[in-house]
A protein has these predicted regions:
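Hydrophobic H-region at the start of alpha-helical membrane spans
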Residues: 45-49, 77-79
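Transmembrane alpha-helices and immediately adjacent membrane-cytoplasm interface residues
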Residues: 76-96
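Hydrophobic alpha-helical transmembrane segments
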Residues: 64-82
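Conserved non-transmembrane functional hotspots
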Residues: 1-46, 72, 90, 94-197
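Juxtamembrane "helix exit" motif at the C-terminal ends of alpha-helical transmembrane segments
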Residues: 50-69
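Alpha-helical transmembrane segments of multipass membrane proteins
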Residues: 29, 56-60, 89
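Hydrophobic alpha-helical cores of multi-pass transmembrane domains in eukaryotic membrane proteins
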Residues: 49-53, 82-85
């Protein structure tokens, strides 16, 4: 690999890394949104169940002559009203499936970045193996990938990500080396007749 190709290769490595980060951050943000969506759905279900339960208990308490305690008969409707207000608040606060839609946007954007990441990885492999050695061809392919990357960002707004997603992505990319395939994984997954290890 000549010096000119090394410089281009370095630029491609940097773009690969940027796409890997964007891909994983978007995936992590999607996971965060889905967890929040499930949490909110569970809260709304709990609020509805408790509201219904206290309403039923209130009706039973009024009908059963054994309960003479006026304090209990007064407190149960107050609890029911409070739970009903909480349930209503949750319904208005967490609009219908907003977080689920945000998660879908993050996943869709991550998929585009993953595709681009794979293309960069293939180009890097072809250059390193010597399949592509001509600097002009490498520059042309680099520019095509840059155009694809620009188009991804031009087609839609980049979905919002949080610091929490960045931290989670950092641990996945740098801590567990999720973007690397180990020899053990290759031996376990790739059919024997296709392995070169």
């Amino acid at each position: 690999m000549n010096e000119q190709t090394r410089i281009i290769y370095r630029i491609l490595e940097e773009r690969y890394v940027k796409n890997a980060w964007t891909h994983i951050i978007q995936e992590c943000q999607a996971e965060i949104h889905l967890k929040e969506f499930i949490k909110q759905r569970n809260q709304m279900g709990l609020a509805a169940a408790l509201t219904s339960s206290t309403a039923i208990i209130s009706l039973i308490a009024k009908c059963v002559s054994l309960i003479d305690n006026k304090y209990i008969l007064l407190v149960i409707p107050i609890i029911t009203a409070g739970l009903s207000a909480w349930s209503t608040y949750l319904t208005f606060r967490f609009k219908d499936r907003v977080l689920e839609k945000k998660a879908e946007e993050n996943k869709h954007f991550a998929a585009k970045c993953h595709d681009l990441r794979n293309r960069y990885e293939s180009l890097l492999g072809d250059i390193k193996s010597g399949i592509i050695a001509d600097s002009a061809v490498i520059c042309k392919l680099r520019d095509e990938l840059a155009d694809m990357e620009n188009q991804i960002y031009a087609d839609s707004a980049t979905p919002h990500t949080s610091n929490k997603a960045v931290k989670l992505a950092r641990s996945r990319l740098l801590g567990s080396y999720e973007s690397q395939t180990t020899d053990e994984e290759i031996r376990a997954i790739v059919p024997l007749h296709l392995q070169i290890l």
